């Protein structure tokens, strides 16, 4: 069974987001070994942090993210620089990885400051924006978990996706 990881920087505090994520996580168990890895957000002293302070925090988060990856795991980073994709294209990405014999894939959601370049360039084959809108990272986690579930139902010929 394929391993799919969702690596997230920051906690999921809102109970309504947590309930939604838990529901899709449970459903995903029928299709893959799905795990969520929650990493702490690096502390930044004040709201008016310098670019250097933010960069240092992102580097600290990057170290934790990269050490969380399985050996040979394909990394898909959620960041604005990437090409947008449809649910069907996400399903194809997941299926292609599963069929390649090296099926492990990790989706990464960074902190509110984004992701360090070292994460974007390390083993990454995809940058996956969630559209051109801005949303809270907790909501992004729920939306991405649902989209991974949707992709799995597409790949298994189920009628969830219309």
Predicted regions and their residues:
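A generic structural motif
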Residues: 29-35, 73
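Conserved beta-strand scaffold positions in the cores of enzyme catalytic domains, especially
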Residues: 36, 75-77, 125-127
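Short glycine-rich anion-binding loops that position phosphate/pyrophosphate groups of nucleotides
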Residues: 12, 80-83, 111-114
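N-terminal beta1-alpha1 ligand-phosphate binding loop
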Residues: 1-28
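General small-molecule cofactor/ligand-binding pocket signal
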Residues: 7, 35-37
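Loop/turn-to-beta-strand initiation segments
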Residues: 3, 103-108
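S-adenosyl-L-methionine/SAH cofactor-binding core of RNA-modifying enzymes
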Residues: 40-105
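Structured adenosyl-cofactor binding patch, chiefly the S-adenosyl-L-methionine
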Residues: 117-162
């Amino acid at each position: 069974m394929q391993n799919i990881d969702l690596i997230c920087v920051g906690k999921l505090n809102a109970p309504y987001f947590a309930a939604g994520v838990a529901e899709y996580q449970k459903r995903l168990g029928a299709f893959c070994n799905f795990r969520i890895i929650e990493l702490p957000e690096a502390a930044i002293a004040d709201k008016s942090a310098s670019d250097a302070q933010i960069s240092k925090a992102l580097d600290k988060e990057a170290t934790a993210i990269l050490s969380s990856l399985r050996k040979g795991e394909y990394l898909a980073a959620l960041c604005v620089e990437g090409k947008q994709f449809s649910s069907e294209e996400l399903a194809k990405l997941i299926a292609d990885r599963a069929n390649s014999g090296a099926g492990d894939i990790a989706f990464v959601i960074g902190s509110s400051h984004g992701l360090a370049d070292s994460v974007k360039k390390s083993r990454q084959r995809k940058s996956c924006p969630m559209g051109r809108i801005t949303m809270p990272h907790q909501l992004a986690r729920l939306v991405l978990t649902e989209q991974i579930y949707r992709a799995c139902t597409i790949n298994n010929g189920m009628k969830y996706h219309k």
